[in-house]
Design a protein with these regions (language model features):
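N-terminal secretory/membrane-targeting segments
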Residues: 1-102, 119-128, 135-136, 176, ...
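Solvent-exposed soluble domains appended to multi-pass membrane proteins
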Residues: 87-496
Length: 496
């Protein structure tokens, strides 16, 4: 009914507009039209068909915040004296890290959609020709997920192997909470740990304070290291990736413990060039669509430039003999919708394109290049994978992810869309995707194997047993949230 009313209003608008504009002065028609427009807008705000304009989003956010305790109530109990996620080894086995520990780099590319990898434009031009070739050198996970659509939440999942909070960013909302992190474990094993942003403000989302509190030695924005010439290559949200990579490696060159092989380095590099303002790619750098006219074409230009600059990272790495023993992961912070389901902004919905990202692990001499196609993994699995690969087994940890090398059955994939009334999701057995909208209570269920485009919602006809199993999986999301809020994720022992 609401949809029909909206359609009728849209169809009648031209007639009303002509009638209103025909009047020489403000009259009853203009007042009536204005009142009807306001009333229709109010109906939309109160309906499931929420407008996604800035005013509508603001009003919805205020409304949701005012009833947050009821809307996001966590109906789950846990012994307040326990730390359910902490796992301890049965025996205090000695660590078995390699005598020559490798350097580790995670290149986290902004808004990196999986759909462009090994794909081409309609006229046959590849979006990511360089990355396509690099896939042959490492291990590619074909179905890899970001656990959220926010950069800070993706970084939390990557470094802490936990489900991101769905109420707020852990970096800001729980800034004083202590967790265990991948950087902390590596630091305890002799690594120098770094977090570099291409964005101008390392304090954005409280990144600096939070990561340094949780195991990162050095957290910096690349902007203070830019030359005047470099600053000419800032557009959109920040500096071009090529400049970011070059200045980062120059910074490493000045770190004597790393250059002298006294310490291996772990570094997460978060790019910013491919962030939202895809239409601001300089015209002379638009390789695929010089006269781009829509989001898809602007994104294509931006991601092609991103791919060109990724070559610079590997070229700079190869120039440095002191880094010849390096592991590199290339992935994204989250995906980005390109109108596959009518959405062109990542703060709106929950389809695959919002979460699916590329994942490539390159570790010469440590693994056989290939592909993993029979299982799905997520950012939460990165920390366990790296520790497994280099042979470090912490005596205690709270990681929920699993190593991609582990001989284990498919684990659930947890998804958090914190915007637009909050959508929470879980992918069971690698194929069954269940999503619940907290604001409305609406449920969505898809068989990703038989319906990869997510067109047929099976929730209304799903059997009770399936729903019960999926609802049970949601307990992990709610328990995760409860433990974060109650500071019961991690209890350090003996200073660790």
């Amino acid at each position: 009914i609401i949809g029909l009313l909206c359609l009728s209003a849209v169809l009648c608008t031209p007639t009303w507009r002509r009638s209103v504009m025909a009047e020489s002065r403000y009259g009853w028609r203009r007042r009536t039209a204005a009142a009807m427009a306001i009333a229709l807008y109010a109906v939309l705000l109160l309906s499931p068909y929420a407008p996604h304009d800035e005013l509508g989003a603001t009003i919805r956010s205020i409304h949701d915040y005012s009833r947050r305790d009821r809307l996001y109530r966590i109906d789950i109990e846990s012994n307040p004296e326990t730390y359910p996620f902490v796992t301890a080894r049965n025996q205090p086995l000695p660590g078995h890290a390699a005598a020559n520990p490798p350097h580790i780099f995670i290149v986290q590319i902004e808004s990196f959609s999986h759909k462009v990898v090994e794909a081409t434009t309609p006229d046959g031009h590849p979006y990511t020709p360089y990355l396509n070739e690099k896939l042959k050198e490492g291990l590619c996970v074909e179905r890899f997920y970001a656990n959220s659509v926010q950069s800070a939440k993706g970084q939390f999942a990557t470094l802490f192997s936990l489900i991101p909070s769905f109420k707020s960013k852990v970096f800001t909302g729980f800034a004083q909470t202590r967790f265990q992190s991948l950087p902390e474990i590596l630091r305890d094993n002799g690594y120098s740990t770094m977090f570099f942003k291409a964005y101008r403000d390392i304090n954005y989302d409280n990144t600096l304070g939070f990561v340094q509190k949780n195991g990162v030695d050095t957290a910096l924005s690349i902007v203070p290291f830019l030359t005047p010439e470099d600053r000419q290559r800032i557009w959109g949200w920040g500096v071009e990736d090529e400049v970011f990579y070059k200045r980062f490696f120059e910074y490493l060159d000045a770190q004597k413990p790393i250059v002298s092989a006294e310490k291996p380095v772990f570094a997460l590099l978060h790019t910013v060039m491919n962030h939202m303002r895809f239409n601001e790619v300089p015209r002379e750098k638009r390789r695929l669509y010089p006269a781009a006219k829509n989001l898809q074409e602007h994104y294509a230009n931006s991601i092609r430039l991103t791919d060109d600059h990724l070559r610079v990272f590997f070229d700079e790495l190869a120039k440095r003999a002191y880094l010849n023993n390096a592991i590199v992961i290339v992935t994204g912070d989250h995906g980005y919708p390109l109108n596959e389901h009518g959405y062109e902004h990542n703060e709106t919905a929950w389809y695959e394109e919002f979460f699916r990202i590329p994942f490539l692990l390159i570790a010469p001499g440590r693994l056989t290049p290939g592909r993993i196609a029979d299982k799905a993994f997520s950012q939460m699995d990165i920390a366990p994978t790296l520790l497994d690969l280099i042979g470090i087994e912490p005596p205690r940890h709270h990681f929920l992810g699993v190593s991609i090398f582990a001989d284990k059955p498919q684990q659930p994939i947890f998804l958090v869309q914190p915007y637009n009334g909050i959508y929470l999701g879980v992918i069971d057995d690698g194929r069954t995707k269940y999503v619940r909208h907290l604001r409305s209570g609406h449920e969505f269920l898809f068989d990703l194997t038989n319906d990869p485009q997510e067109r047929n919602n099976l929730a209304p006809t799903a059997d009770a047993a399936m729903k019960k199993r999926l609802h049970a999986m949601f307990r992990t999301i709610y328990l995760n949230q409860l433990l974060i809020e109650k500071d019961r994720i991690w209890k350090p022992v003996d200073g660790h």
